[in-house]
Structure formats: C-alpha cells, structure tokens
Amino acid sequence: MSSIGTGYDLSASTFSPDGRVFQVEYAMKAVENSSTAIGIRCKDGVVFGVEKLVLSKLYEEGSNKRLFNVDRHVGMAVAGLLADARSLADIAREEASNFRSNFGYNIPLKHLADRVAMYVHAYTLYSAVRPFGCSFMLGSYSVNDGAQLYMIDPSGVSYGYWGCAIGKARQAAKTEIEKLQMKEMTCRDVVKEVAKIIYIVHDEVKDKAFELELSWVGELTKGRHEIVPKDVREEAEKYAKESLKEEDESDDDNM
C-alpha cells in the first residue's frame, strides 16, 4: 500500500485502505518537528524541562512559554503547535475548575488526563475539524497518590510514564532518560539531569539559540506546580554545560 495520502488525507474521518488516518499522522508530524520537551517522575515529584527555540533575536525573553499551570497541583509541558497547546491548556483548566466546584477537592490527575484525552480524540472523528497538532504532558503530586505523569498525543491516547520525551529529539532524550534511576532520585537531582538531557539533545547546527524552561511539582513545593527558582535553574544549567564539556573532552581523548 502507498504511504502517500492520495485523497485519503483530506479528512480526519476517512481511513486509508491500509487502516491509517493520515490527518492524525500529520498532526504527529507537527509534534515531531517541534522543540523537545521532557518530563521525569521521581520519588518526591515531577520535573518538566522544555527546549524553547528562540527563532528571532527580537523576541522578548520569556515569551511564548511552553510550560503551563493547569491547576495549583497540576503542571503541563507541550510540544507542537503552541496555539493548539494553549487551547488545550484552557480546556484542562476548565475541567479542573469544574471538578473542584462539583466535588470540593482537587481533580485526580488520571481523571484529568482521561477527560482531556477524550476531548482531543473527539477532534479526530469529524471532517469539519482537524486534529490538534500538539502532544503534552501532565504532572502532579499529592500525599495520597504521590507523583504522577501522563502524556497525551494527537490521537487522544493517554499514557502513564516514569519518564517521557516529546518533540524532535524524543528518541535521543528517551535514551538518556532510561539511564537514570528515577525511583531513587529527588526533584533536586532530577532538575540537573533534565537540564543536561536538554543540552545533550539540542541540535546546535540547525537550532542555534534556545531558552531552557524548567518547572516542578512535588514534596519540595508542597504539592504546587511552580517554575524552578532562578538560582536552581542556573545551577542546573551550569551542571549541564560542565557535563557536556567533560563528555566532549573524553571523546577527544579516545580519538
């Protein structure tokens, strides 16, 4: 069967003869062309890191963020089309707010992930709409449930993870994440490793400038999702650059 759409890619409600929905695959392609985002769950929380590419020197520092607060206890990291991601962040916030209004307590992350995944999936069923061109991770921490991390892709499937990467360098990032002993690490340890992984997978040839965005939610923040403090972020970036330099020197010695 041909891998080219040839008419079967005009609508998200049409299957190709070999059982593929091309519009959903194209949406996933938009995620694969985006900057890398990673999320790591550890014993006392969840840490997010995003490689936010700076496409112009004229951009104001800190603009076009790819990390969002969904609720006090839930954070979100995105890859793909930023406008689509913002729309889904608003949907997730609405779900969390409605749940608290109805039941009087914070929404469990699995329930939130399932609800938003159902919404994303609905946009793959009709010809009048297009799939969302973004993937995103949701992370939270509570005393009862501990740390939790979920990823939702453009097809509307929700996965639970210990460590996850989305975006153009996801495979390289996953390889680095697999080397970590996540169940034994704390958020403070993981922040450094997240920064290091983002620096390792960043392609300096194609994408020169980038901003590192870091956030965490865990015991350290009393269950609130917060941007990593500036001094901790700078320390993590310093560790990442030094580790990268050491690896380059060891490679030169081995040649």
UniProtKB/Swiss-Prot annotation:
In the record, which positions carry N-acetylserine? 2
Compartments where located: Cytoplasm; Nucleus
InterPro entries in UniProt: Ntn_hydrolases_N, Proteasome_alpha, Proteasome_alpha-type, Proteasome_asu_N, Proteasome_sua/b
PROSITE patterns assigned: PROTEASOME_ALPHA_1, PROTEASOME_ALPHA_2
Q: Does the keyword Kinase apply?
A: no
MF-aspect GO terms: ubiquitin protein ligase binding
Q: Name one GO biological process term.
A: proteasome-mediated ubiquitin-dependent protein catabolic process
Its domain of life reads Eukaryota
Q: Its GO CC terms?
A: cytoplasm; nucleus; proteasome complex; proteasome core complex; proteasome core complex, alpha-subunit complex
Indicate where the modification Phosphoserine is found in the sequence: 243, 250
Q: Which UniProt keywords apply?
A: Acetylation, Cytoplasm, Nucleus, Phosphoprotein, Proteasome
Which residues, renumbered to this chain, carry the PTM N6-acetyllysine? 57, 206, 230
**Family assignment from sequence similarity:** Belongs to the peptidase T1A family.
What role is this protein assigned?
Answer: Component of the 20S core proteasome complex involved in the proteolytic degradation of most intracellular proteins. This complex plays numerous essential roles within the cell by associating with different regulatory particles. Associated with two 19S regulatory particles, forms the 26S proteasome and thus participates in the ATP-dependent degradation of ubiquitinated proteins.
Quaternary structure? The 26S proteasome consists of a 20S proteasome core and two 19S regulatory subunits. The 20S proteasome core is a barrel-shaped complex made of 28 subunits that are arranged in four stacked rings. The two outer rings are each formed by seven alpha subunits, and the two inner rings are formed by seven beta subunits. The proteolytic activity is exerted by three beta-subunits PSMB5, PSMB6 and PSMB7. Interacts with AURKB. Interacts with CDKN1A. Interacts with MDM2 and RB1. Interacts with the C-terminus of TBXA2R isoform 2. Interacts with DNAJB2.
Q: Any idea what this protein is called? A: Proteasome subunit alpha type-3
Organism expressing this protein natively: Rattus norvegicus
